[in-house]
Regions:
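Active-site scaffold segments
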Residues: 76-78, 86
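Short active-site loop/helix that positions an aromatic residue
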Residues: 84-94
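Basic polyanion-binding and macromolecular-assembly surfaces
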Residues: 1-76, 97, 104, 108-111, ...
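Surface-exposed cap/loop segments at beta↔alpha junctions
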Residues: 88, 102-104
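Domain-exit/linker segments immediately C-terminal to small folded modules
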Residues: 115-117, 123
Length: 374
């Protein structure tokens, strides 16, 4: 281990640091070119809307998360903060990154779930109902009662990097240290229509007899009748002059400095080892080349004509150019992980009996138990 490398960013990690965050802007384009259509994710209408409001919402947005600003500008979400976090976190399942974090696997029936795939991370239900629940609960309580994040960093460090909320037990909230989102600016909304025609007219050909009460809609769902799909979501298209797709990412250095251990001093060596380790993981995720094949119809590539912009932002608002290659970030992370000592891999089982006991409790009993845990 190179001590100079592992301590390279200590000025960012000490309590009196003036560094607020690293910020990155990356401009992207559809793989086919700027003038082609891309498909954002679609979402269900909010539950609190009435049926009339839901219909109006679908007509206006087609299910996309798109905002219309004063003056006619539009902003469309292409990949959410949560989706980006899931994509970044997944790199720690593969080489050469997997050795940087403990690999925690929970067996649920015939399925093995890697903690890195759990949407709520250390606070996920797959953890709460596993044989590791007491260990995770103790780690969250260590943060809540003592401000000591080391136990959680030993078992689920990416839950610190990408954030989690232990809402069902201790109530501990960990903000995202790494936050990324992809948005498209100045886009026009498009529609599309489609028609499915079966290879055989099953009813008119006498191949099937339709029982009484079976509607044409049911036949369509079964693939036995024509199925039109008219005026549905057809993607978005960048406007020729101002349209752009941009990934905005932040690495919150202040959030790392808020991490402590059970040592007395705010900047003691044990605490700095923890902060270096978490910073190393964050830098690896922040600088790694990520797959931007987001979904069907939405494959993006970096805009070769607009290089990414990396800056270190100070608390006084000053912006400084910042440069760090992914190889440099990985080397720093490896040295910091060696110094911190990565926690061991864990294999656990989903506790069906415990889950059954919890499900059998009344709503009032669960609320009382939750209050007691907090």
């Amino acid at each position: 281990m190179d001590t100079n490398i592992s301590k390279r960013f200590d000025d960012w990690l000490k309590s009196d640091s003036s560094a607020a965050a690293l910020v990155m802007r990356q401009w992207l384009l559809p793989v086919e070119g700027k003038d082609t259509v891309i498909f954002p994710p679609t979402y269900a209408a909010p539950n609190e809307m009435s049926e009339t409001e839901k219909r109006q919402w679908r007509q206006q947005t087609l299910g996309y998360n798109i905002d219309r600003l004063d003056g006619g500008a539009t902003v469309c979400q292409i990949d959410s903060v949560g989706a980006q976090a899931n994509r970044m976190e997944a790199i720690f399942k593969r080489e050469p990154y997997k050795k940087l974090v403990p690999q925690v696997t929970i067996t649920v029936g015939q399925t093995k779930v890697n903690l890195l795939d759990a949407g709520h991370r250390a606070a996920d239900g797959v953890v709460r109902f596993s044989s590791l629940r007491d260990k995770f609960d103790a780690a969250f309580r260590s943060i809540k009662d003592n401000g000591d994040a080391e136990p959680l960093a030993k078992i689920a460090p990416t839950s610190i990097v990408f954030g989690c909320w232990d809402s069902q037990s201790t109530g501990v909230k960990l903000p995202r240290i790494v936050r990324s989102v992809i948005r498209a600016y100045e886009v026009d909304l498009l529609h599309r229509s489609a028609q499915y025609t079966p290879p055989v007219r099953y009813v008119s050909a006498g191949v099937i007899e339709v029982p009484e009460g079976v509607s044409d809609r049911i036949l369509s769902k079964l693939g036995l009748r024509d199925t039109p799909a008219s005026w549905t979501h057809g993607g978005v298209k960048l406007r020729p002059e101002k349209g752009e797709i941009r990934r905005d990412a932040v690495l919150n250095l202040a959030a790392i400095r808020a991490l402590g251990t059970n040592e007395a001093g705010p900047d003691d060596e044990k605490t700095l080892k923890l902060r270096r380790y978490i910073l190393g993981l964050a830098l690896v995720a922040f600088t790694a080349p990520h797959d931007t094949n987001l979904r069907e119809g939405c494959q993006l590539v970096p805009n070769a004509e607009r290089p990414s912009k990396w800056e270190l932002v100070r608390h006084d608002g000053q912006h400084e150019k910042f440069s760090l290659s992914h190889d440099e970030a990985l080397k720093f992370a490896e040295d910091a992980a060696h110094d911190f000592v990565v926690g061991p891999d864990e294999d656990a089982n989903f506790d069906q009996q415990y889950a059954k006991q919890q499900l059998a409790k009344s709503k009032e009993e669960r609320k009382k138990e939750k209050r007691q845990r907090k």
